[in-house]
C-alpha cells in the first residue's frame, strides 16, 4: 500500500488516502485530517528573506509515540541551525536544532512565525506565517559523556557534528 520515492537516498513515502476515507465513511465515521497545501511551500524569494535562525516545528511520531486517546502526534519546537535557503554541505538540505528522536524520519519540518509580523516586518495582529521547509531524515548519535560521534543516515534531522566533551 505504501509507495516510496524512486531515489533510495530520499526518505519519503506516501499511502493513497482515499481508501482509508472511504472505509471510515462506510463505518459511518467521518475522519478528521488536514493536508499540507502547495501554498505552504516557500518561494525562492521567501527563502532569501529568512534568517539563519528561524523558529521551526516538527510534527511526528518518535519511536511510535503519540496520544492514542486523542489521536494526536507529538509536536517538537526548535530552530534552524543553518540557513534554510542555503545548501548545507553542498546538498539541498539545512540543519535544525530541536529534540528529534529515532523514528521521526518522514516528519514534516515547518517554519513557524507566530510573532504577529509578516515577512516584511509589518505588524499584522493575529496572522501566523507557516511554511513547510523540509522532511526530517537524519540525526546524530549523542553519548552521555558529551560526545557527538557520527551522523547516522537513517531517521531524524541533520545537526552539526561537534567532537568536544561537555
Segments (PLM) and residue ranges:
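Serine endopeptidase catalytic core focused on the charge-relay Asp
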Residues: 1-102, 106, 111-114, 121, ...
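C-terminal binding/interaction regions
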Residues: 134, 143, 155
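Short active-site-adjacent structural elements
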Residues: 141-147
Amino acid at each position: 500500500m505504501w509507495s516510496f520515492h524512486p531515489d533510495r537516498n530520499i526518505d519519503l513515502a506516501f499511502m493513497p488516502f482515499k481508501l482509508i476515507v472511504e472505509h471510515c465513511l462506510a463505518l459511518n465515521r467521518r475522519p478528521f485530517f488536514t493536508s499540507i497545501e502547495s501554498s505552504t511551500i516557500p518561494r525562492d524569494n521567501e527563502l532569501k528573506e529568512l534568517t539563519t535562525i528561524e523558529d521551526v516545528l516538527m510534527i511526528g511520531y518518535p519511536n511510535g509515540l503519540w496520544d492514542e486517546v486523542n489521536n494526536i502526534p507529538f509536536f517538537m519546537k526548535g530552530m534552524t541551525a543553518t540557513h534554510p535557503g542555503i545548501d548545507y554541505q553542498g546538498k539541498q538540505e539545512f540543519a535544525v536544532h530541536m529534540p528529534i528522536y529515532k523514528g521521526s524520519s518522514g516528519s514534516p519540518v515547518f517554519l513557524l512565525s507566530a510573532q504577529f509580523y509578516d515577512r516584511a516586518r509589518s505588524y499584522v495582529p493575529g496572522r501566523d506565517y507557516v511554511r513547510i521547509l523540509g522532511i526530517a531524515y537524519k540525526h546524530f548519535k549523542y553519548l552521555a559523556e558529551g560526545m557527538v560521534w557520527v551522523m547516522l543516515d537513517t531517521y531524524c534531522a541533520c545537526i552539526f557534528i561537534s567532537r568536544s566533551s561537555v
